């Protein structure tokens, strides 16, 4: 859970693409999405954006890959209270309504695996699915680690997209349980670490990066110089 504005070492895959490293369970990532949308709305030219998953709770996972309730996250109550204070400040600054009462036990791994599936198989629906997963957690307080919730989101996105094919929710459920897709997701997590990403959100563009829910003007400087 990061909210500082320090530059990092992460690099984007292409000079004209903004890579956003993010995790659905991070409130600052949700706020960062809002800042990015404000910046994109102010731009004259379109901006290519690539989502890259990041495992914010990697140090809490057991050998089976699941969250271990007994694991020490290294964060105490004072940390979480300070984080909430920062979230509230940014909510007001960016005009974002969101709940801070979600369970800390929510695991985003299934959501990120489902999102990779949607991006690969239904690319025209990815942006809407990605947004709805964030909204489901931070607006509706739903457990986005639940395959039923993810299937419902996929069905809603597909039915609302008149230009693309509806997302096959049976295939989405199968993708969540697919060991090969899980291995691919873990590979993306490793790529983020190898790129020097240590916190989220991280925005990377042309060899430069900004970390945290930075305001639109910071994104403008990152991208436009």
Predicted regions span which residues?
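Secretory targeting signatures
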Residues: 1-11
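C-terminal cap of thioredoxin/glutaredoxin-like
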Residues: 3, 21, 25, 33-47, ...
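A broad, low-specificity signal for short, low-complexity segments enriched in glycine/proline
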Residues: 12-13, 74-78, 163-166
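Extreme N-terminal starter segment of soluble prokaryotic enzymes
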Residues: 13-19
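Short, cysteine/histidine-rich loop/knuckle motifs that typically chelate Zn2+
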Residues: 28
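Structural alpha/beta surface segment adjacent to cysteine/selenocysteine redox centers
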Residues: 33-137, 141
């Amino acid at each position: 859970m990061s909210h500082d504005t320090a530059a990092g070492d992460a690099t984007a895959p292409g000079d004209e693409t903004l890579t956003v490293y993010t995790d659905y369970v991070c409130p600052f990532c949700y706020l960062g999405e809002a800042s990015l949308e404000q910046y994109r709305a102010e731009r004259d030219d379109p901006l290519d954006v690539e989502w890259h998953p990041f495992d914010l709770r990697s140090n809490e996972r057991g050998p089976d890959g699941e969250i271990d309730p007994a694991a020490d996250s290294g964060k105490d109550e004072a940390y979480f209270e300070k984080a909430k204070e920062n979230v509230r400040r940014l909510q007001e600054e960016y005009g974002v309504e969101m709940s801070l009462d979600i369970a800390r036990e929510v695991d985003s791994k299934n959501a990120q695996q489902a999102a990779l599936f949607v991006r690969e198989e239904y690319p025209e629906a990815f942006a809407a699915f990605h947004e709805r997963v964030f909204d489901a957690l931070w607006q509706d307080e739903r457990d986005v680690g639940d395959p039923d919730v993810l299937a419902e989101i996929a069905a809603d996105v597909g039915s609302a997209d008149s230009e693309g094919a509806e997302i096959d929710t049976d295939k989405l459920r199968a993708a969540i349980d697919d060991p090969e897709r899980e291995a691919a997701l873990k590979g993306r997590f490793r790529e983020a670490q190898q790129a020097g990403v240590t916190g989220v959100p991280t925005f990377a563009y042309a060899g430069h990066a900004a970390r945290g829910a930075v305001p639109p003007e910071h994104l403008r400087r990152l991208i436009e110089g």
